[in-house]
């Protein structure tokens, strides 16, 4: 298909926007998180409008999603269920898995390893749920102690069953709202919201 002319970014965004608008249907309820519900399509619209720099639309769409995914779903009690076989109120859309998402991750060799090393500047408090679910103490081949980051990696290493791959979750929607606020000249509101999310 090399002979076909390439569409511009604007044309692509316009076409995707049209398709997402057509896909919206309030009757498409979220009976199961691995169904593409109306709210999951709304999440995709937020991503598209943020990419397009249409910040008023991002704020409007996230305001609509806020009724289903209020700030309260950002808490540790809800968060921990995102990486389990339990339902989570913070999961907007998740790919259903019958097997582990990763079948062969190597932590024992540098050449075949899957490394995402946390900066020493990042330090979770002991009671922070992100530490429990995301942080992996590790010794590098040069005997240096580091901390790896990766929820699915840790679940695989610890042989914890993974039922969902989280494609869209409430925290993503709220972070897109933070960015839209900041880029709309509402830096104070953006900082206040980000700080509430970090509590």
Functional labels for PLM-detected ranges:
Residues 1-173, 183-189:
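Structured, solvent-exposed acidic/aromatic patches
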């Amino acid at each position: 298909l090399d002979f076909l002319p390439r569409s511009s970014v604007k044309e692509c965004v316009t076409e995707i926007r049209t398709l997402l608008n057509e896909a919206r249907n309030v009757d498409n309820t979220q009976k199961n998180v691995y169904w593409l519900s109306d709210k999951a399509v709304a999440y995709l619209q937020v991503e598209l409008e943020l990419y397009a720099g249409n910040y008023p639309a991002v704020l409007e769409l996230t305001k609509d999603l806020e009724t289903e995914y209020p700030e309260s779903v950002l808490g540790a009690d809800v968060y921990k269920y995102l990486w389990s076989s339990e339902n989570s109120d913070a999961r907007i859309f998740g790919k259903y898995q019958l097997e582990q998402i990763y079948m062969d991750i190597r932590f024992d060799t540098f050449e075949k390893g899957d490394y995402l090393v946390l900066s020493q500047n990042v330090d979770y408090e002991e009671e922070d749920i992100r530490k429990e679910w995301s942080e992996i103490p590790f010794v590098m081949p040069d005997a240096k102690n580091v901390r790896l980051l990766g929820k699915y990696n840790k679940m695989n290493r610890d042989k914890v069953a993974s039922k969902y791959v989280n494609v869209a979750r409430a925290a993503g929607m709220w972070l897109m709202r933070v960015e839209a606020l900041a880029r709309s000249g509402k830096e104070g509101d953006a900082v206040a919201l980000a700080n509430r999310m970090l509590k």
